[in-house]
Amino acid sequence: MMDVAEVEENLFAASDAKLHGEMCKALSTMYCKVSSIFPSLEAARHRSKAGIEAICSLHVALEKAKDVLQHCSQCSKLYLAIAADVVLLKFEKPKSAIKDGLKQVEDIVPRSIACQCQEILNELEGVKFALDPTEKQVGADLISLLQQGRQCGDSSDASELECFHQCAIRLGITSSREALTERRSLKKLIERARAEEDNQKE
């Protein structure tokens, strides 16, 4: 069985998150604890259809959690701030799926492993995802700027540019290197949105 620290080291460090660091830390801990007992769950499950489905459901839930963590470590900071409410839902979905998966598996594994599942479920009950107030405010400010831009056209008003610059600074985009990284992340996001024909994201 893998050690929790070993799984966590291979997956995610809190410093990897460009934004929503506390939520990433909580989800990463959740992911690592379940992943550390997953081989035991897989080995102990019944070879029935229900057992296979339960393990598959839990595996899918873990993959969803991993995707969210990677999203927050690779995506644009500006986008993560603007789409904060959507990102919050992205965290809630794998948490709920992991809980459901553990409950299914709990009924088909030996008592000793079922107890480990229950311990994790008890911990999950105490996990409450919430947006960082500062990041949420920056996102609101950026949305306001974008809405003003749509109403006024392609404005180059100095006060708007300064406000945008301050938002970037509050998100930690303070050097030319960080600005370049952000531009690359935005470019990838726009290219993906165009490929998916996602006009809202674009």
Spell out what each predicted region is:
Residues S48-K201:
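Alpha-helical bundle protein-protein interaction modules that mediate dimerization/oligomerization
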